[in-house]
Amino acid sequence: MRDKLKSFFTEHWKYMAVSTACKLNIFDHLKEAKTAKHLADELSLNEDKLLLLLNALSNAEILDKTSNYFKRNSLSELLTENNPESLKYACLNWNDEHLTAWQNLDYSITTGKSSFEDIYGQPFFDFLNDNPEKLQAYHKAMYQYAKDDYKTLPDLIDFSKHKSVMDIGGGYGAVLENIKAKYPSIDCILFDLPKVIEKVTIPSIKKLGGSFFEKIPNQSEAIVLSRVLHDWNDEKASLILKNSFEALPQNGTLYVIENCSDK
């Protein structure tokens, strides 16, 4: 029991090792086996410290090690930039500001206020909108998560009864991409902020820019809200729902997809 408890104390070490390797593009450069010296020279890193990191990743079975050579395996292959199934940005998403906010959790529990806002002086999504690189990285992460998490959604919901489906706050379009793959005849419409929409490169879906706190265009007989409402307080979540209902035709359908707790 004590050992199980003690293991909790250092769980973040593994994540920090993996996310640091992602941040430094280490996995991208280990398609072929290399020594720590070779990789350090290639990426302008400190050889001694890099060797410690590579050994840690090998012990965690994230890298394969043969003699003094390290090479990525099937796990770390998923943390490379150009892999179609990549989780690199999903991994990086929980670093930096997220970690800092978690370290301030006691403030939130004590005051009932946002630990993120206490540190950064603004709500999380305002912070993203003021930092374009962070915004792009965030939506890349959400896209990578959604490609996995919503892979079976078109099997669970019969979208064939709709001529059109609009994803509200759909980021880079992963949900619609999954729907379109199974129901190619459906008109798929992505609605998100203009600065998000301009980065979307899926040719098979229509893209509309705007805010779900304002008017949502009446262009679809079905609307999907996937993991949107939990990001907002009750007042703003109610406004999103109100605007979504107003955007639907009389017999339209609203699909709300959320992770639900017991209460």
Question: Which stretches of residues belong to each language-model region?
Answer:
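Alpha-helical subdomain
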Residues: 1-59, 64-65, 75, 159, ...
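Conserved Class I S-adenosyl-L-methionine-dependent methyltransferase catalytic core
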Residues: 2-29, 41-42, 48-163
